Swiss-Prot record:
<dbReference type="Pfam" id="PF00883">
    <property type="entry name" value="Peptidase_M17"/>
</dbReference>
<keyword id="KW-0464">Manganese</keyword>
<dbReference type="Pfam" id="PF02789">
    <property type="entry name" value="Peptidase_M17_N"/>
</dbReference>
<keyword id="KW-0031">Aminopeptidase</keyword>
<keyword id="KW-0963">Cytoplasm</keyword>
<feature type="binding site">
    <location>
        <position position="265"/>
    </location>
    <ligand>
        <name>Mn(2+) 2</name>
    </ligand>
</feature>
<feature type="binding site">
    <location>
        <position position="288"/>
    </location>
    <ligand>
        <name>Mn(2+) 2</name>
    </ligand>
</feature>
<dbReference type="GO" id="GO:0070006">
    <property type="term" value="F:metalloaminopeptidase activity"/>
</dbReference>
<feature type="binding site">
    <location>
        <position position="349"/>
    </location>
    <ligand>
        <name>Mn(2+) 1</name>
    </ligand>
</feature>
<comment type="similarity">
    <text>Belongs to the peptidase M17 family.</text>
</comment>
<dbReference type="InterPro" id="IPR023042">
    <property type="entry name" value="Peptidase_M17_leu_NH2_pept"/>
</dbReference>
<feature type="binding site">
    <location>
        <position position="347"/>
    </location>
    <ligand>
        <name>Mn(2+) 1</name>
    </ligand>
</feature>
<dbReference type="InterPro" id="IPR011356">
    <property type="entry name" value="Leucine_aapep/pepB"/>
</dbReference>
<keyword id="KW-0479">Metal-binding</keyword>
<feature type="binding site">
    <location>
        <position position="349"/>
    </location>
    <ligand>
        <name>Mn(2+) 2</name>
    </ligand>
</feature>
<dbReference type="InterPro" id="IPR043472">
    <property type="entry name" value="Macro_dom-like"/>
</dbReference>
<keyword id="KW-0645">Protease</keyword>
């Protein structure tokens, strides 16, 4: 993990110094002094607008002409219009800086920031820049044994001086704890499915959360059978690896205060079962457990901060595999709620896992609200692409709060429709419901949401986040490499902190 330290200006001792310049290209007195120390290098660079214009996100690394001293490079970072800067933009700028200096093989970087930028104090800006750099420093290359040393390069340290280092440190320490939740989510999601079997995944959850005073229970197939979880167990019955239900209970306030329940789909690998998927890109189905990973990452972020809230996380961990024991299209399963479901397509398995998991969470913990997170449907990818996750909810206020939190951390949600017509589409001729709609190709995300909605008890606020399009990316972003994004951790942490702290 990138080492970040807030220190006094005279203690800065780094190979590169970051310089913020907006699109007006005017240097304040501090930058004029720095420019003079470096023989006009900054002013000469910005005078040539072909080299640097100050637009947001532009990074220009220039070697220092001063032979003495530690600073070998100046890193010009464009702010664009200061009036348009947001927390998201500042944080992403930190990520862009880290990525550029990593490519330039610069081991230590420094930043001096004493003045306000737009509406933000220097300590606030510094914490956001450091947070973005930290998130962007993430790597998952432990299985790459032939990497050249040059390709293993990482930035070692980030030294920052502000007008209030104590405040900057306090702000950043919170963001660092959240990043640890994001990194766990990315790590476990990126793991190959042969490495993260349900048992191994469950053990990793227990190992990290029990150190944070979270009670973790792992239910095996015998316990789930006794509870009547026929839907979840049916999905995993074709696999040699036993299905698990992991229950994470965090009490940060009065035990009588209501719980928030976070429920995650954890399909460790999804072949589609007997309704087998095409082989093209099937390897990406290792990411079909990203909803569960987001729930665990959120529990880490909340518990490590010791937030004064009560939260339970429930994740169903299964493998959807074809075999002689696998569930067949046309099978009928009885859920923990007592309702029955006809499995018309074994590749619509996530909603079956969630049906039993959300019911268990409600029966055991009586939560005020339930939020489930799942890479549930390809239809949501068609609808929203890689920009938004879909948000379905039976409560307008809950949906609005989630959407607001998502905007604040750039994990965007788009409200999607629920309607009685969609609910009618999942009626079955031989069971209480079917696991796919009866109009081929129509409203697949909404019918999936309605399936889950049938397991939400009266009076419980509920939201379903379909993250299939945003959970993993085939290209890098400002805050991380391609692969698992860690989507949902920062969104849910922000939502919980803004709405449920006692």
């Amino acid at each position: 993990m990138l080492h970040v330290n807030f220190t006094e200006e005279e203690s800065l001792n780094t190979q590169a110094l970051i310089v913020f310049i907006d699109d007006k290209l005017k240097l304040d007195s501090e930058l004029i002094n720095l420019d003079q120390q470096h023989h006009g290098l900054i002013s000469k660079t910005i005078a040539n607008k072909l080299q640097f214009t100050g637009k947001y996100g532009q990074i220009k690394i220039i070697p220092s002409v001063v032979k003495s001293g530690e600073v070998k490079y100046l890193v010009l970072a464009g702010l664009g219009s200061e009036e348009k800067l947001t927390e998201v933009k500042i944080e992403e700028l930190g990520g862009k800086i880290l990525q550029n200096v990593t490519n330039a093989k610069i081991a230590t970087i420094g930043l001096k920031i004493k003045n306000r930028i737009s509406n933000f104090t220097s300590s606030h800006v510094a914490s956001l820049i450091a947070s973005g750099a930290l998130l962007a420093s993430y790597r998952f290359d432990k299985y790459r044994t032939t990497l050249k040393e040059a390709d293993k390069f990482v930035v070692e340290s980030f030294e920052i001086s502000t007008d209030n280092n104590a405040e900057a440190t306090k702000l950043f320490e919170v963001k660092k704890l959240i990043a640890e939740g994001v990194f766990f989510t990315r790590d476990i999601s990126n793991e190959p499915s042969n490495i993260k079997t349900p048992q191994i995944y469950a053990e990793r959850i227990a190992d990290i959360l029990e150190e944070l005073n979270v009670d973790v229970s792992i239910l095996g197939e015998r316990e789930m059978k006794n509870l009547g979880m026929g839907a979840l167990l049916g999905v995993g019955q074709g696999s040699q690896n036993e299905s698990k239900l992991v229950v994470m209970e965090y009490q940060g306030t009065n035990k009588d205060a209501p719980y928030i329940a976070l429920v995650g789909k954890g399909v460790i690998f999804d072949t589609g079962g007997i309704s087998l998927k095409p082989s093209n890109n099937m390897h990406l189905m290792r990411y079909d457990m990203c909803g569960s990973a987001a729930v665990v990452g959120t529990m880490i972020a909340v518990a490590s901060q010791e937030l004064p809230v009560n939260i339970v996380g429930v994740v169903g961990l299964v493998e959807n595999m074809p075999s002689g024991n696998a569930q067949r299209p046309g099978d009928v399963v009885t859920t923990m709620s007592g309702q029955t479901a006809e499995v018309l397509n074994t590749d619509a398995e996530g909603r079956l896992v969630l049906a039993d998991a959300v019911w268990y969470a409600q029966e055991k913990f009586k939560p005020k609200c339930v939020i489930d997170v799942a890479t549930l449907t390809g239809a949501i990818v068609v609808s929203l692409g890689p920009t938004y996750a879909g948000c379905f909810s039976n409560n307008d206020e809950l949906a609005d709060k989630l959407i607001k939190a998502g905007e604040e951390v750039n994990e965007k949600l788009w409200r999607m429709p629920l309607h009685e017509d969609y609910d009618a589409m999942i009626n079955s001729d031989i069971a209480d419901m079917a696991n796919i709609g009866n109009v081929p190709g129509a409203a697949g995300s909404s019918t999936a949401a309605h399936f889950i909605k049938r397991f939400i008890q009266e009076g419980v606020e509920w939201a379903h986040l379909d993250i299939a399009g945003v959970a993993n990316s085939n290209k890098p972003s400002s805050l991380g490499p391609k692969g698992a994004v860690g989507y949902g951790v920062r969104l849910l942490e922000k939502f919980i902190k803004e709405n449920y702290e006692q």
